[in-house]
Amino acid sequence: MSLSNETKAKIVADFGRDANDSGSTEVQVALLTAQISHLQGHFSEHKKDHHSRRGLLRMVSQRRKLLDYLKRKDVSRYTGLIARLGLRR
């Protein structure tokens, strides 16, 4: 259920400051968004997988915390990121 290394590298290249920038807030949010999207497809087929649903809720909570942090620190980066990812708020 995790993302492939190629997908992760592409996300890091798209959202990071350079090819090795895997720790910036934007990259972390983008990776979590990709994992959340992947899990949503999983739940359409496996409706009773409550163990994975708990992991999904944890990822959503972590993404929310990172977005709140980014909004506090730099509003322009926050608005640009949610526009690029197509998130609400």
UniProtKB/Swiss-Prot annotation:
Signal peptide extent: none
Keyword vocabulary terms for this entry: Ribonucleoprotein, Ribosomal protein, RNA-binding, rRNA-binding
GO CC annotation terms, alphabetical: cytosolic small ribosomal subunit
The keyword Ribosomal protein belongs to this UniProt entry's keyword annotation: yes
PROSITE patterns noted in UniProt: RIBOSOMAL_S15 (PS00362)
A GO MF label: structural constituent of ribosome
Record-annotated membrane-spanning stretches: none
Quaternary structure note: Part of the 30S ribosomal subunit. Forms a bridge to the 50S subunit in the 70S ribosome, contacting the 23S rRNA.
Job of this protein: One of the primary rRNA binding proteins, it binds directly to 16S rRNA where it helps nucleate assembly of the platform of the 30S subunit by binding and bridging several RNA helices of the 16S rRNA. Forms an intersubunit bridge (bridge B4) with the 23S rRNA of the 50S subunit in the ribosome.
Record-stated family: Belongs to the universal ribosomal protein uS15 family.
Protein name as catalogued: Small ribosomal subunit protein uS15
Organism: Erwinia tasmaniensis (strain DSM 17950 / CFBP 7177 / CIP 109463 / NCPPB 4357 / Et1/99)
